Regions:
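Mid-core helix/loop region of P-loop NTP-binding domains shared across ATPases and GTPases
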Residues: 91-141, 145-161, 165-177
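Walker A/P-loop-proximal flanking segment of P-loop NTPase domains
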Residues: 1-47, 51-59, 128-129, 410
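Conserved catalytic segments around the Walker B and adjacent sensor/switch elements
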Residues: 40, 61-77, 139
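Active-site metal-binding core of divalent-cation-utilizing nuclease and nuclease-like domains
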Residues: 431-462
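Conserved NTP-binding/hydrolysis module of P-loop NTPases
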Residues: 66-67, 79-103
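The catalytic "switch" region of P-loop NTPases
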Residues: 9-10, 148-249, 263, 267-297
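Nucleic-acid nuclease catalytic cores
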Residues: 478-482, 489-518
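Winged-helix-like regulatory helical subdomains adjacent to P-loop NTPase cores
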Residues: 218-343, 349-350, 377-387
C-alpha cells in the first residue's frame, strides 16, 4: 500500500509521508530523558506533539519501560481522587501488558488500591513498579491540559512532584522522566487552592525544566518529506523550490506544511480538472492548494475563530498589527502576547510581535474582512461587477486601481481624515478580495508593513501584481515611497507595479498617474 500525507492523528513512517524527526527524537532522549528531566512539550494545536511522543516511545522501548497515556476523553477519571487513581491504574496495567512486563510486576500492579488514600496508594505502586522493573520507567501523558483546570489533576501533579523531590534526596524511587504534552504550559497554571482564595500562579509542576526545542519544520525538513514522496511518484518536481515556497507560506507550521502537500497530492494532482501530477508539483499547483486550504473548513481555523471570540483583546492586537501596522514589543510576560504565542498565532520577529505565518495572516485578514463586508457598499459593488475586471481570462489590475479611485471618490470622499487613515487599507482589501476571490491569491508582505505602508502581493493564474499602499503626509514621503516601490519591483523582477496613496495634505491633487523609472512603470492612484 502506498503512503499518504497525514494531517489527523499520529503520523506513522511506514504509512505516511512525513518529515524525518529522528534527529529531534535523539536530542530529546539525550538532553532530557537520559538526564532524568521532567518537562512539558507545550505547543499549539496540530504541531506534531502526538507524533513526537509516538516516535519517542518507539525509540525508548528497547532501553526503558515506557508508560504512554492520554487524557483525551477521560473526563470521568477526574470525578474524585479515587476514580483518578483507579483509571490510571487500569491504563498503566494495559501499558505494562503491551510492553511485555513480567507477570509478577503486572500482578503486583493490579493489587487493590486503598479506599481511604487512593492517591497515596497509587504513589506506593509507582515506587514498587520502578523498583521491580529491570528498566528505568518513563511516563508520557498526551493531551494533559484537557483536565488542567481540575483540582484533582493538580493533586496528581503534586504526587509526581513529591516523589521526584524525595527521589532526588534518596528517599524514594520513581519515574526516570515524565513528559507532559499539551497546548498550555502546565507550569504556569492559575490555581485556586481554596474556593475563596484569589487566583494565583502556583503550579505543582515547577520541577519541570524548560523544553526549548524548535518543533517547526525548516526547509531541509520539508525537503526530506518531499524526497520520500518523489521516490515513489517521480514527478520531476524541483524539490528545493517547492520546499521554499511551502516554507514561505507556512513558516514550518507542521499541520500547514502537511496539509498543503496533501491537497497538492490528493486534490490538485488527482481530482481537479485537467489533473496532472507533474503540473501539480509546481508553484502554480501549490498556490491552488493554498487557495483550497484557505477556503476549506478545518479544525485549526475553527479553533482560531473560537479563540478570537474568547479573547477580544488578542483579536484587537491582531487587527492593529494587520491593518494599522502597529509594532508591539515582544514580551511574553504580557498575557495577551503569551496567549497568542501559546495558540500559535504570534511569534517574535527581531523583538517585535508578528503573526506566525503567511497562511495565518491571510486567514485572519479574510476573517476580519468578512465581518466588515456584509453591509459595505465598496465590497458589494466590487463583487457585483467582478466580471468587468477580467479580460482574456486575466485580471486587469490597471482597471482595478482606476475603478477603486472612482468608487472611493464617490463613497468616501466626505469622510474625515481620521476615518480614512484608520480604515483606508481595510477598504482597499475589502474592494480587492471579491474581485480575485475564487481564482487568485493575495498576501500582505509582513516584512515591509508598518503604520504608513502596506505591500500587497496578488497572484492571479501565475501572474504577480505588486501593490503598495501608503499613508501620505508630505511630498518628500511620497517620493520616498515611489523609490521603495521601484526597488521592490526590482527585487521581485517585475516591470510594473501599483501605488495607492491616501493623501492628507491640504492642497492635495487626487487622480491616476503613470510613473516611470529605470525601465519600470508604476500606476499611482492618489485619493
Amino acid at each position: 500500500m502506498s503512503k499518504r500525507f497525514c494531517v489527523t492523528g499520529t503520523c506513522i513512517p511506514a504509512k505516511n509521508y512525513m518529515v524525518d524527526i529522528s534527529g529531534r527524537v535523539d536530542m530529546i532522549i539525550h538532553d532530557y530523558i537520559d538526564k532524568g528531566q521532567y518537562f512539558t512539550i507545550n505547543r499549539a494545536r496540530q504541531y506534531g506533539k502526538t507524533t513526537t511522543l509516538y516516535m519517542l516511545e518507539q525509540r525508548l522501548k528497547s532501553d526503558y519501560l515506557v508508560i504512554s497515556l492520554s487524557f483525551e476523553a477521560v473526563d470521568e477519571y477526574f470525578a474524585s481522587l479515587g476514580t483518578l487513581a483507579e483509571g490510571l491504574m487500569m491504563d498503566i496495567a494495559e501499558c505494562l501488558k503491551n510492553q511485555n512486563a513480567s507477570e509478577i510486576i503486572i500482578e503486583e500492579w493490579n493489587e487493590p488500591l486503598s479506599d481511604k488514600f487512593p492517591l497515596r496508594s497509587l504513589g506506593m505502586k509507582i515506587t514498587k513498579l520502578c523498583k521491580a522493573s529491570n528498566k528505568k520507567v518513563v511516563l508520557m501523558i498526551d493531551e494533559v491540559d484537557k483536565s488542567s483546570d481540575n483540582q484533582i489533576f493538580l493533586s496528581f501533579l503534586g504526587l509526581l512532584r513529591e516523589k521526584y523531590l524525595k527521589c532526588q534526596q534518596g528517599k524514594d524511587i520513581t519515574f526516570q522522566s515524565v513528559i507532559l504534552a499539551g497546548v498550555y504550559d502546565v507550569k504556569s497554571l492559575k490555581l485556586k487552592i481554596h474556593p475563596q482564595e484569589e487566583t494565583k500562579y502556583n503550579s505543582p509542576w515547577n520541577i519541570a525544566v524548560d523544553f526549548s526545542m524548535d518543533m517547526s519544520f525548516n526547509i531541509n525538513d520539508i525537503k526530506s518529506m518531499l524526497e520520500d514522496y518523489e521516490r515513489e511518484h517521480n514527478t520531476g518536481m524541483d524539490i528545493g523550490q517547492i520546499s521554499s515556497i511551502i516554507y514561505d507560506y507556512t513558516s514550518g507550521y507542521p499541520y500547514l506544511v502537511s496539509r498543503i502537500c496533501q491537497l497538492t497530492d490528493e486534490r490538485i494532482a488527482s481530482y481537479e480538472k485537467d489533473a496532472d501530477e507533474k503540473k501539480a508539483w509546481t508553484k502554480t499547483g501549490l498556490l491552488q492548494a493554498i487557495k483550497l486550504l484557505l477556503k476549506e473548513p478545518n479544525t485549526l481555523f475553527d479553533d482560531m475563530t473560537k479563540k478570537l471570540l474568547d479573547y477580544p483583546a488578542l483579536k484587537d492586537m491582531l487587527q492593529k498589527i494587520l491593518f494599522d501596522g502597529i509594532d508591539f514589543p515582544f514580551k511574553r510576560e504580557n498575557p495577551i502576547i503569551d496567549l497568542g504565542v501559546t495558540f500559535g498565532f504570534l511569534k517574535d520577529r527581531n523583538g517585535i510581535v508578528a503573526v506566525a505565518n503567511r497562511i495565518f495572516e491571510t486567514q485572519l485578514y479574510d476573517t476580519f474582512l468578512s465581518e466588515m463586508a456584509v453591509n459595505d457598499k465598496l465590497y458589494i459593488d466590487a463583487a457585483s461587477n467582478r466580471n468587468q475586471y477580467i479580460a482574456s481570462d486575466m485580471l486587469q489590475m490597471d482597471l482595478v486601481m482606476k475603478k477603486f479611485y472612482e468608487y472611493f471618490e464617490e463613497i468616501y470622499t466626505e469622510n474625515d481624515h481620521k476615518f480614512i487613515e484608520e480604515n483606508g487599507r481595510k477598504l482597499f482589501l475589502l474592494y480587492l478580495k471579491p474581485i480575485i476571490n475564487g481564482t487568485g491569491n493575495y498576501y500582505v508582505e509582513a516584512r515591509t508593513r508598518d503604520n504608513r505602508r502596506t505591500d500587497i502581493i496578488v497572484d492571479y493564474k501565475g501572474k504577480r501584481f505588486i501593490i503598495e499602499l501608503k499613508i501620505w503626509h508630505g511630498n518628500e514621503y511620497n517620493l520616498r515611497g515611489q523609490k521603495q516601490l521601484f526597488d521592490y519591483l526590482d527585487y521581485y523582477k517585475e516591470d510594473r507595479g501599483y501605488l495607492l496613496s491616501f493623501n492628507f495634505n491640504k492642497n492635495k491633487q487626487t487622480g491616476v498617474n503613470e510613473l516611470e523609472y529605470d525601465g519600470k512603470k508604476i500606476l499611482e492612484v492618489v485619493v
